[in-house]
Amino acid sequence: MRMRHKPWANDFLAENADIAISDPAQYKGRWNTVFGNDNPIHIEVGTGKGQFISGMAKQNPDINYIGIELFKSVIVTAVQKVKDSGAHNVRLLNIDAETLNDVFERGEIKRVYLNFSDPWPKNRHEKRRLTFKTFLKKYEEVMGETGEIHFKTDNRGLFEYSLKSFSEYGLLLTEVSLDLHNSDPKGNIMTEYEEKFSALGQPIYRAEVEWRTKDRL
């Protein structure tokens, strides 16, 4: 999908530097100082327009959230949503997920959210999928010995691929739903895509896996 250029985006992000962190690598290993507390940190890779992360932050004030979004034209919308929500436990980073271990120390992150990631359906693009083994390794590098991935998608092919990828990587599947909205999901915060697909009657697939790297070190 082609993103519309927003020439004002740089100025907007600079004006909201308390939310959109411009040089996140400087905080590697000390994100607690950014939030002013030692609460656990959860990240969302591919934060999009920010509905999920701002909702989660409001629902869980004792957890710190960091959203990762590659596209500047999208993250500006997320910044505005965080501002409108009034949540103070959210920061947003305009970076590539490939650079996670440049930004976070091992063990600094407790949970990774992957919501409606691009399925990259062509085989030649497999390495771009956020549940491909090289990305799982990056999540491992920032979570350390324990951690979790919470994964949602409307794409059955990506879901099946991801379950296989998780299993081959040695992760433990703790929850799985083939139709999330018909299984009474407690505390579920919907993304913009989730609202759209759910309204069309499409099932939403969800999985939780535990990161038990100590079993493989």
From Swiss-Prot:
The keyword DNA-binding does not apply. S-adenosyl-L-methionine binds at residues 44, 69, 96, 118. NCBIfam families: PRK00121.2-2, tRNA (guanosine(46)-N7)-methyltransferase TrmB. InterPro entries: SAM-dependent_MTases_sf, tRNA_(Gua-N-7)_MeTrfase_Trmb, tRNA_methyltr_TrmB_bact. CDD domains: AdoMet_MTases. Its EC number is 2.1.1.33. Pathway: tRNA modification; N(7)-methylguanine-tRNA biosynthesis. One of its GO terms (cellular component) is tRNA methyltransferase complex. Belongs to the class I-like SAM-binding methyltransferase superfamily. TrmB family. Keywords: Methyltransferase, S-adenosyl-L-methionine, Transferase, tRNA processing. The keyword Repeat does not apply. This is tRNA (guanine-N(7)-)-methyltransferase. It comes from Bacillus velezensis (strain DSM 23117 / BGSC 10A6 / LMG 26770 / FZB42) (Bacillus amyloliquefaciens subsp. plantarum). The active site is at residue 118. Signal peptide: none annotated. Catalyzes the formation of N(7)-methylguanine at position 46 (m7G46) in tRNA.
